[in-house]
Amino acid sequence: MAELDRKELADLVRRLSVVQGCVTLSSGKQADHYVDLRRATLHHRASALIGRLMRELTKDWNYTVVGGLTLGADPVAIAIIHSPGRPIDAFVVRKYAKTHGLQRLIEGSEVSGQRVLVVEDTSTTGASALTAVRAVQDAGGDVVGVATVVDRGTGAAEAIKAEGLLYRSVLGLADLGLG
């Protein structure tokens, strides 16, 4: 990984996304800080860094499509597909299938028969990533691994690896001065 880019991203995430105070995470766990990574993934400079760093992090994984559970994964996937390198397409996993139109759970690029990278913005327990993994597998996709921008160090890596999947992250809480 380009260390200067990684340090710059950590600085941006710390400045834009770290919120101090007691919060309830999506897992139901309590924390004394929150990493609202959408503030970084939707920032012009941070998004470009995320795209480059995620491509670098997963360069040895052979995948053609990237995405994950909406909403956190969406800007991460878009950053990756717009980062320089080989062509990669994106998809979005809805939390629930639509009840009208095509009633799809997965929108965007087709995942059936494809090698797929599942992404997240921030990982806590890995539940969101694993929800996306199951949806992709049910749709006929081959998940090559899971990558996240920030790993909170609270069980996501272990849960994802327990499912037999590769797992990597760009940053940990220590990189943000929180660990």
Swiss-Prot record:
Query: Into which EC class is this enzyme placed?
Result: transferase
Q: Which GO terms describe its biological process?
A: 'de novo' UMP biosynthetic process; pyrimidine nucleobase biosynthetic process
Keywords of this entry: Glycosyltransferase, Magnesium, Pyrimidine biosynthesis, Transferase
Where is orotate annotated to bind? 124, 152
Q: So which residues are the signal peptide here?
A: none
Q: Record's superkingdom?
A: Bacteria
Molecular function terms from GO: magnesium ion binding; orotate phosphoribosyltransferase activity
Subunit: Homodimer.
What function is annotated for this protein?
Catalyzes the transfer of a ribosyl phosphate group from 5-phosphoribose 1-diphosphate to orotate, leading to the formation of orotidine monophosphate (OMP).
Q: Which HAMAP family match?
A: PyrE
What name appears for this protein in its UniProt entry?
Answer: Orotate phosphoribosyltransferase
Annotated source species: Mycobacterium leprae (strain TN)
Gene expressing this chain: pyrE
